[in-house]
Amino acid sequence: MINSPRVCIQVQSVYIEAQSSPDDERYVFAYTVTIRNLGRAPVQLLGRYWLITNGHGRETEVQGKGVVGVQPRIAPGEEYQYTGGAVIETPLGTMQGHYEMIDENGDAFTIDIPVFRLAVPTLIH
């Protein structure tokens, strides 16, 4: 979890066994992000950047406008939650990144998303 003066980000990831195929080096993960506005004014998420790293150190960058097709506006005290997915070639990897946001005055700010793990549950003890 990371906090800024205005925004709190929480991420949870889960392995999707039914969509994965280890024999084909295809490991599918879902991640759910909760974005809470802790400030006194609305904020809007405009863009995202992800750095996805597989267990061999191979990096993939993903960036774009909004999340899951929207640029949510989050009122004070409210939260926005969405679920995304990632496919990697190894049973263990990581994701990290940032969100590009604006406040009610149109001033831009960035919220970092710390590294979180993508892992097949049997690998973690």
UniProtKB/Swiss-Prot annotation:
Transmembrane parts of this sequence: none
Residue ranges of domain ApaG in the record: 1-125
Any one GO BP annotation for this protein: error-free translesion synthesis
PANTHER family the UniProt entry points to: F-BOX ONLY PROTEIN 3 (PTHR14289), POLYMERASE DELTA-INTERACTING PROTEIN 2 (PTHR14289:SF16)
Protein name: Protein ApaG
Protein's gene: apaG
